[in-house]
C-alpha cells in the first residue's frame, strides 16, 4: 500500500498545521475525510510492507499513530491468515506497538489515523 504526494502536489502546508487542524476540526465525517486527505498528500511516498517494516521511513508527527491494513504471514504472527491484519506504528519512534485482526472484506483497504491524545478518536478513509 502506498501513500504520498499526488504527482507534484505542492507542499503548501506544514504538517504541524495539519495536525492542529485535526485536533481542532469540527467532529464531522466530511471534515475528517478532507483533513486526512490533506495529511496523506503531504507525506513523502512510502510503502508499508509486513515483512520489511524496519525500512519504513515516516515523518515525526508527534503522538499521531498510523494503522494500516496489510496481508500477514501466519508463520510470523499468531493470527488467522484468512483475515487482513492491522498494525499500529508509532510515527515518533518507528516501533510497531500492536497488531490485531478484523473480519473485513479483503476488497476494503482502509488507513486509520489515531490521535491518542484526543480520546482515542479514530479517523479513516478508504484507499
Curated annotation (Swiss-Prot):
Residues 1-13 have a biased composition (Polar residues). This is Putative uncharacterized protein YJR037W. Partially overlaps HUL4. Residues 1-26 are annotated as: Disordered.
